[in-house]
Amino acid sequence: MTGRIFTADHHVYDLPPLLSWNVRHTGTVPCDSWSVTAVYQPEMLTVLRMAAGFAAIENGMTQLRGIVDEYTVELGSRGMTVTLSGRGYAARLLDNESRPVTYEQVTLRELIRCHAEPYGISCGAAADLRPTVPYTAGAGISQWKVISEFCRTYGGFLPRFAKTGELLATPEQDSGKRIILDSGSPVLNCRIREDHYGVLTEARVIDKRQNVSYSVKNPEMIAKGGQCRRVIYTPGRSTWDAMRYTGEYQIQQSKKEEQAVTVTLPGSFGAFPGDRVTVRLEKLGLTGNYRVAETENRFSAREGAVMIWTLKECG
């Protein structure tokens, strides 16, 4: 893999051959992250001090665009090395707060123009969301929160980032691509985890102004003996639909980390968040269709190139 640096004064610099690297894709928040280590050369110092952007390039294809958060020069057992690390482009929106603002009527495109484009974010696709009610961005929230809450409330989805750094503000689509994992796949490690901690059995939504409440339950977790209730207060004049949606959303959010399959394979960049995987690992009792939620691609002289996929069951 090639690590390419973009400086604040618009110069491009390719790092020396990498000794090790790690690229993690989530597609959303927590945002993508990366780190690379290379042999340090004294002439690099000027570049490092101005390093602002990063691209991970594998076989001529960009696998990640991000920002540079830090660099470290070290004299150790491997000689003089430099390690750089940073995050994906979602960091540009997470690191910047919005001023308080209320839009009487606003489209998603207009929201992106005001809250994403000023921070160097280009939009690859945006849903045609045009709510007829006011939308308020409160004080102290990030630009990411402004856009993601709008998409969640009026579109029922969360925006994400392509590996090239473009914002994708549309519902995720199934590309039709299928990855097969079966007994013939070169699986180095596979782990199944189920964690009930924090999974809600009930979400009670209360509108204090109207003195009404709505309860949404999670029968699957109740059947497993779970007992975890949350009470959520909403702004006044909430509709029954809005209250039900809020309760269902809280339960779905609590279930996101309940089950996960982690698979380690040789190679790099074989999957990306959103890809679909058909699993047929009968020895583990593991079969079904899964969505790639997160990937980690790493390389070192000791273990070579490996990729770790975190899979979640397709809903």
At which residue positions do the language-model features occur?
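Envelope-exposed proteins and targeting segments
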Residues: D32, L64, M80-V82, K163-E166, ...
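Acidic, small/polar-enriched beta strand-loop surface segments
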Residues: M1-R4, N59, S148, K163, ...
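Short intrinsically disordered coil segments
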Residues: M50-G53, R99-Q105, S183-N189, E220-M221, ...
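Amphipathic, non-transmembrane alpha-helical segments in extracytoplasmic/periplasmic proteins
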Residues: V36, G86, P100-C123, G138-A162, ...
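Oligomerization/assembly interface segments of phage tail-like spikes and tubes
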Residues: H25-P42, G79-Y89, V205, E257-L265, ...
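Short beta-strand-centered interaction patches in the first periplasmic/extracellular domains
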Residues: G79-T81, R87-A90, A125-G198
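Short, surface-exposed secondary-structure edge patches
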Residues: P42-L48, A126, P266-G270
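Assembly/oligomerization scaffold segments
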Residues: M1-E97, K177-R193
